[in-house]
A protein has these predicted regions:
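Flexible loop/turn connectors
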Residues: 1-96
Length: 96
């Protein structure tokens, strides 16, 4: 599992350079679900985050602070309020 999709692609390249095949010899997964990798093969398993929701929460927190609300931050979202969606694709299929 990689910290993001781009790192997963780098790991895949390194594995391939050693003659390993994905997913037969090694499974690969990323984190981001970035559009630019839609054509990567085998399709990359990843975790998709609700970026629009994260943006809205960040905007609200910033607006409160700019308005002078220096409260305890209780109104701000915590990391537990954001949930990702696991998207399983071919890069993590079990070897046949």
């Amino acid at each position: 599992f990689s910290v993001n999709d781009v790192m997963a692609i780098g790991a895949a390249a390194a594995l391939r350079s050693e003659g390993l095949r994905i997913p037969r010899d090694a499974a690969i997964a990323g984190f981001d679900d970035i559009e630019t990798l839609r054509d990567f093969r085998p399709a990359l398993s990843t975790v998709r985050l609700p970026l629009e929701d994260i943006g809205r929460l960040a905007t609200r927190a910033t607006q409160r602070r700019l308005a002078g609300d220096d409260g305890d931050g209780a109104e701000d979202a915590s990391p537990g309020d954001i949930t990702g969606e696991v998207t399983l694709r071919r890069s993590t299929e079990a070897a046949a």
